């Protein structure tokens, strides 16, 4: 078995895919209407956005984590684009920030 990618459910896959493409510095791959993919480099899990008419309550049991060399600057950049900070976290060996994208999906930025 191999990883195919990470699918994010959304009411508007075109808008959310465009936001993530800009956030990650990648291009939109394919737009099939109900499914939009990103062109991702080999070191990034393929991302796709799937249209659901009704988004289930209690979602976000799984979320992506992204590494960054400058946690504060990257957090500021994403907030300026429409992300929301949920919580800043510091553990003995790791520093990270939990955010939501404009659609309310959780993700973490982790200091390298």
Give the positions of each predicted feature.
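Vicinal oxygen chelate
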Residues: 1-10, 22, 27-30, 37-39, 54-77, 95-100, ...
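Short connector loops at helix/strand junctions that flank enzyme active sites
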Residues: 33, 42-44, 57-61
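Hydrophobic ligand-binding cavity/cleft-lining segments
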Residues: 11, 16
């Amino acid at each position: 078995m191999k990883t195919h990618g990470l699918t994010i459910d959304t009411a508007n896959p075109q808008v959310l895919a465009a936001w993530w493409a800009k956030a990650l510095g990648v291009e939109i791959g394919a737009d099939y209407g109900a499914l939009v993919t990103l062109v991702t480099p080999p070191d990034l899990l393929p991302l796709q956005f799937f249209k659901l008419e009704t988004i289930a309550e209690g979602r976000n049991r799984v979320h992506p984590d992204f590494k960054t060399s400058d946690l504060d600057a990257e957090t500021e950049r994403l907030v300026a684009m429409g992300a929301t900070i949920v919580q800043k976290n510091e553990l003995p060996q790791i520093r990270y920030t939990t955010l939501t994208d404009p659609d309310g999906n959780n993700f973490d930025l982790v200091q390298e």
